A protein has these predicted regions:
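Extended recognition/assembly regions associated with phosphoester-bond processing machinery
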Residues: 1-176
Length: 176
């Protein structure tokens, strides 16, 4: 994508699986070679749209909680093939989907995101119309809380819904 569409900006928001030190180092090298690739640590705001990976949906997280959570992930090494096979089996059996459905119901999940935003972005409700995030693997769109619409693009994992979403951009990015 970077080579074939070098005239476009590609924004990559790091998530927990991306925080492994060797991976982030490789991404930094890649982005230094390709100026069209923009790497964002926790969020990207473009106009009145906010994009997050979504780890803050695990529990009510403030910024220091997110930093600790990601630090733990950064220390991980690649899982052995047996873990990947076990994860794949759980997906085939529907266990992963069942867990996600129980642990990430929309109202609870969106309230966790709102709590996180309250801690990291003062007055976000006045600055944001739409918040896009992932992590939970559960697709939904236009869940409204306090006038802000929340969207989750789901997951491309077998048995989960994947929901690519369109949005309109009006100005230049502000990000962290």
């Amino acid at each position: 994508l970077i080579v074939n569409f070098s005239n476009l900006e590609i924004h990559y928001i790091l998530g927990n699986h991306d925080c492994i030190t060797k991976f982030t180092e490789s991404l930094k090298k890649l982005s230094s070679k390709h100026k069209s690739l923009k790497i964002h640590g926790t969020q990207l705001q473009i106009d009145r749209l906010l994009f997050l990976h979504g780890e803050c949906t695990n529990w009510k997280m403030d910024e220091s909680d997110l930093i600790r959570f990601r630090h733990a992930w950064s220390q991980k090494k690649m899982s052995p093939r047996s873990h990947a096979l076990l994860y794949d089996a759980m997906d085939k059996l529907g266990v992963s989907k069942g867990f996600h459905n129980c642990y990430y119901p929309k109202p609870v999940t969106v309230k966790r995101v709102a709590y996180h935003l309250d801690k990291i972005l003062p007055n976000w409700r006045e600055k944001i119309d739409h918040c896009y995030f992932g992590h939970t693997h559960l697709a939904f769109q236009n869940y409204s809380l306090d006038g802000v619409h929340f969207h989750n693009t789901g997951s491309g994992i077998r048995g989960m819904e994947f929901l690519p979403l369109n949005f309109s951009i009006n100005s230049s990015p502000n990000n962290k």
